[in-house]
Regions:
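Aromatic- and glycine-rich beta-strand/loop motifs that create alpha-glucan
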Residues: 1-26
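Terminal transmembrane helical anchor/hairpin motif
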Residues: 4, 40-69, 196-271, 275-288, ...
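Secretory targeting signals
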Residues: 67, 71-74, 122-182, 186, ...
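Long, hydrophobic alpha-helical segments
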Residues: 72-101, 120
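Membrane-interface alpha-helices at helix entry/exit sites of multi-pass transporters
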Residues: 111-123
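Central hydrophobic cores of alpha-helical transmembrane segments
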Residues: 185-198, 326, 349-361
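Internal/C-terminal transmembrane anchor helices
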Residues: 295-301, 334-376
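Function-determining sites in protein domains
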Residues: 350-357, 367-727
Length: 727
């Protein structure tokens, strides 16, 4: 009983010393939670009053907003939690920074573990009690205004528990920093290091791999790790995932955080027990931690300095890397020693650690610079590869990627989606392409030792060679994933690409439509230049149509995709995005389905629909621009300029407008739409220096539209070449 009374008495005394923290916490929650809640409710009432009769979904929208505000995704509560955790963590054990106060506290006849528990528990209560009070106030406000339902109540409780867990994580990390240091300023710096160190290391690693390895592929996991290796970033990321309903993933993450919190509490308690009283006022509380922390900071900071100077220099010269390494090494080492000793004269104290850091930095840089582990030329043994996933750059650029499993944040980079959802069980062609990519890497490295990226050309013949990016994920038998990116010439690998493209396993990962359910799609419409029609389909018809389209997509070859122009575009509307898919003339069942529902799937632009074709030679424009640098316009030098004669526009030099049917009939088969070209630009050859603008009549009432086109390579009619002075 005496022990219990002493515990409570010490707890009350500690609370008296921390009244300012309590006031700050209460004020923060009241202003940024309760008051903001009242403001939001007032805004909701105004919206209902002004928009209720016009918007039938306004109440549902307000309900979702209330859930978001009271739930884990409330950004203001997250900020309060972070600030309160840092403040309470740093201020709770403030007496450890004063020798007199340390002697006073440690003279109390109470075990250190109990002193630690008192201060730790008070820091938790300073957060929990104001949060609970203001959560109840928010419940009352919402209830009075008829926004309080069971879902809102449970969402608030979920947020309460979730925020407490991450408060404990951030709070305990700050306490560990205090235990390791003996000065408030150093404690603050140490806390910042602990919060950011993981993200910093992952970022440095990613930057070096990206800078030095030609085949390095940065995927979603890297970006995610940079965020989540910081407890602050992990907090925000997990809050978003809860709102998006990740289920079992969240449970596993929360369990891992709880285990980490328990380990950190045990570690902090151990440090408090072992912390010498004379550590007060010193930079570091434990001598053994000084070199460990010093090396853990100096080495990555030096690497960051080197890559920073190298990146700033346009030449990416290795000399700037070396300069940056040395500069950052000396400066960071000196600053840390000054902090350790509180003496500028000891900036280079412990020269052996400085030399050791320099050696470690040099070894790491040499590993990257000379690829000592053969990262760029490594390829798993084919017998060890379970499946391969690939993403081919410059192909089907119109495809939009979205993962319905990830709710509102499902948007993703196209290669990430394909690599995550594709499993090619017959890896032969994909594996052969990877080997060709490695040979390309070796060729580049043998010619250009100071390479920066895979886009350096090997020889003069390669200047006119078209390359595509080839991203690969090897999934090994042990479930390990290996990612690589290669740049490969089109001409010598086209046959292998055709084999990959026709593989159903490839298409299932390349086209997201294969992963859809009919209920993912709200509506389906179809459009061309002449018509835009939205279909009224039930779930069975939507499912039937999607299956029809996928079946025809299965049989579509790479040759078809890049050489046959589509006749129409399908638009699949979901809750989040609209997705476009092309209808090709060979998709007979798809076209029949569209025709049966009143859309002409065979209607294309014919020469009879074309009002005029305007052609411009960009080379002439470039010559004109070059002349203007010297004060001479092209019109002056050739005495030709755009003018009108009796109201008729005269084409200037390098341009020509064709309106006669004979010319149009000869030009139109030789051009392709600009958007179709850009969708597959790597695999289609066009005359890029010539712009073609086609004016198309879209009805019988003189309404027209204009579209950009390109001439196919080597198919420009002779009379056009003469008319625009094309060389």
């Amino acid at each position: 009983m005496t022990s219990k009374n002493l515990f409570l008495k010490l707890q009350r005394e500690d609370m008296k010393r921390r009244v300012w923290s309590i006031a700050l916490s209460m004020l923060g929650f009241f202003l940024l939670f309760t008051v903001v809640c009242a403001m939001e409710v007032s805004n909701y009432a105004y919206r209902i009053k002004t928009m209720g009769e016009f918007d039938s979904n306004i109440k549902e929208w307000i309900h979702n907003q209330v859930i978001r505000f009271i739930g884990p995704a409330n950004e203001l509560v997250i900020v309060i939690t972070m600030v309160c955790a840092v403040v309470c963590g740093l201020s709770g054990f403030f007496y450890l920074h004063s020798k007199k106060k340390v002697d006073l506290f440690h003279s109390i006849p109470v075990r250190r573990e109990k002193l630690f528990a008192i201060t730790y528990l008070n820091g938790l209560l300073i957060y929990i009690v104001p949060y609970m009070i203001n959560l109840l106030l928010c419940y009352i406000i919402l209830g009075i205004n008829n926004h309080m339902v069971m879902e809102v109540f449970l969402s608030g409780l979920t947020a309460f528990g979730f925020n407490i867990i991450y408060y404990l994580l951030i709070y305990t990390i700050a306490i560990v920093a205090v235990m390791l240091t003996g000065n408030i300023v150093v404690s603050f710096l140490g806390t910042a290091v602990f919060y950011l160190y993981g993200s910093f290391i992952v970022g440095i690693k990613d930057t070096y791999f990206n800078e030095f390895f030609m085949t390095y592929l940065s995927v979603n996991d890297t970006e995610r790790m940079i965020v989540e290796m910081s407890p602050l970033g992990n907090y925000v990321s997990t809050a978003d995932k809860i709102i998006e309903g990740y289920g079992s993933d969240i449970i596993g993450r929360i369990i891992a955080v709880i285990v980490l919190i328990i380990a950190l509490i045990a570690f902090a308690t151990f440090l408090y027990k072992k912390r010498p009283s004379e550590a007060a006022g010193k930079a570091m509380a434990f001598e053994i931690s000084r070199p460990i922390i010093k090396l853990a900071l100096v080495i990555p900071i030096s690497l960051a300095g080197g890559i920073l100077f190298m990146s700033i220099s346009n030449s990416h010269d290795i000399a700037w890397l070396i300069f940056g390494l040395i500069f950052a090494l000396v400066i960071s080492y000196g600053i840390i020693e000054i902090i350790y000793n509180f003496d500028v004269r000891k900036a280079l104290h412990g020269v052996y650690y400085l030399l050791g850091s320099a050696v470690a930095v040099g070894v790491i840089v040499c590993i990257f610079q000379f690829d000592l582990f053969n990262y760029d030329t490594y390829i798993p043994k084919q017998n060890d590869v379970k499946t391969i996933s690939v993403a081919i750059g410059g192909l089907d650029g119109y495809i939009r990627y979205y993962d319905f499993d990830y709710s509102s944040s499902g948007g993703t980079y196209n290669h990430n989606y394909q690599l995550d959802h594709m499993e090619i069980s017959n890896p032969e062609p994909a594996y052969e392409l990877a080997k060709i990519g490695i040979e390309q890497v070796k060729s580049i490295k043998s010619v250009n030792k100071n390479y920066k990226s895979m886009y350096n050309v090997v020889d003069t013949d390669a200047i006119n060679t078209k390359f595509y990016t080839y991203k690969v994920k090897y999934t090994l038998d042990n479930e390990r994933n290996i990612y690589r990116e290669y740049t490969i010439p089109v001409d010598s690998t086209y046959d292998l690409l055709k084999d990959i493209y026709i593989d159903l396993d490839y298409k299932k990962g390349h086209y997201p439509i294969y992963m859809w359910n009919a209920d993912d799609v709200n509506s389906i419409s179809c459009s061309n230049l002449f018509e835009d029609k939205k279909f009224s389909l039930n779930d069975f018809e939507k499912k039937q149509f999607i299956e029809i389209y996928k079946e025809e997509l299965n049989n579509n070859s790479l040759d078809d995709t890049i050489s046959i122009q589509p006749t129409a575009t399908l638009i699949f509307e979901t809750n989040n995005y609209d997705f476009n898919y092309y209808v090709y003339p060979t998709f007979t069942n798809t076209i029949n389905f569209l025709n049966d529902r009143g859309f002409d799937g065979t209607r294309v632009v014919g020469t009879e629909d074309i009002k005029e074709i305007f052609v411009e030679n960009f080379n002439i424009r470039l010559e004109d621009a070059e002349g203007e640098k010297h004060g001479i316009t092209y019109a002056e030098s050739t005495q030709v300029a755009t003018k009108e004669v009796k109201g008729i526009a005269i084409d200037r030099e390098g341009t020509k407008t064709y309106t006669d049917p004979a010319s149009i009939m000869e030009i139109y088969p030789a051009i392709i739409p600009g958007d179709f070209y850009w969708d597959n630009s790597v695999f289609i050859d066009v005359e890029n220096s010539i712009e073609v603008i086609v004016t198309i009549n879209i009805d019988d009432y003189e309404n027209f539209i204009t579209r950009s086109y390109y001439f196919k390579a080597n198919e420009i009619p002779e009379f056009v070449i003469r008319d625009i002075n094309y060389k």
